[in-house]
């Protein structure tokens, strides 16, 4: 909370998107609220909101299927717990993102099941008139690198495009689909714009996850390079803020 308060004091207008569901659960545990279940999670998120938290990222969802989760993501929070955190966040008025890590040991059926679960949670959120909801879905390709699953090949380019296109068709109740260029590569993100993505993320100067898993992953793009890539793909670049509102600079 001190970090949030300090940031808001120094930059009062800044929007803070922080803390994955995994980190929220960890905060509940170390603050002795982990045993309180949903109430403990709600207490933690409410306290973070009071000190400046504006929204949640979507990390940590991995793949919801229990078999896959137990085999590939031992020690991480379950899909059910991830959903609990985001459901509480939405009820408290926060928007969030949803992710899916694909291309490892899961099946295509597991991916579809994951998307259906996200879709159903968004439907519940809309039906209950929650002031928060999922803003974007982000399919993330598995990058073998030096992980424990390094012998796996990871998804092909065609598999990446199909997964994103299917997510856009299935998740029509989620406004945005992101082609996260730093994991997809900027070239793949260009193709994904043609397959249903409407967001490729920002400049990103350093992304520890991909840097650990693959030292060859490019870590930065200039604004000019991003705009050029978007235009080359046949689209007009638009700068947005965290809540997907268009940013205007110098009246443009």
List the model feature ranges, each with a label.
Residues 15, 29-32, 115-116, 123-252:
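Auxiliary Fe-S-binding modules of radical SAM enzymes
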Residues 1-120:
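Conserved Radical SAM active-site core
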């Amino acid at each position: 909370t001190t970090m949030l308060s300090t940031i808001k004091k120094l930059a009062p207008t800044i929007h803070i998107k922080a803390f994955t569901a995994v980190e929220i659960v960890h905060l509940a545990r170390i603050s002795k609220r982990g045993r309180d279940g949903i109430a403990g999670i709600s207490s933690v998120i409410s306290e973070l909101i009071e000190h400046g938290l504006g929204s949640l990222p979507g990390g940590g969802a991995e793949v919801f299927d229990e078999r896959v989760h137990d085999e590939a993501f031992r020690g991480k929070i379950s899909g059910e717990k991830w959903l609990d955190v985001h459901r509480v966040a939405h009820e408290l008025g926060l928007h969030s993102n949803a992710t899916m890590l694909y291309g490892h040991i899961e099946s295509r059926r597991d991916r579809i099941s994951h998307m259906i679960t996200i879709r159903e949670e968004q439907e519940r959120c809309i039906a209950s008139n929650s002031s928060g909801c999922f803003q974007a879905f982000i399919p993330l390709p598995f990058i073998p690198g030096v992980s424990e699953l390094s012998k796996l090949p990871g998804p092909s380019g065609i598999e990446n495009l199909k997964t994103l296109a299917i997510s856009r068709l299935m998740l029509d109740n989620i406004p945005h689909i992101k082609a996260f260029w730093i994991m997809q590569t900027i070239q793949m993100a260009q193709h994904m714009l043609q397959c249903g993505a409407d967001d490729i993320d920002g400049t990103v100067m350093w992304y520890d996850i991909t840097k650990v898993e693959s030292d060859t992953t490019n870590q930065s793009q200039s604004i000019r390079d991003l705009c050029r890539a978007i235009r080359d793909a046949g689209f007009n670049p638009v700068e947005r803020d965290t809540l997907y509102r268009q940013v205007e600079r110098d009246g443009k």
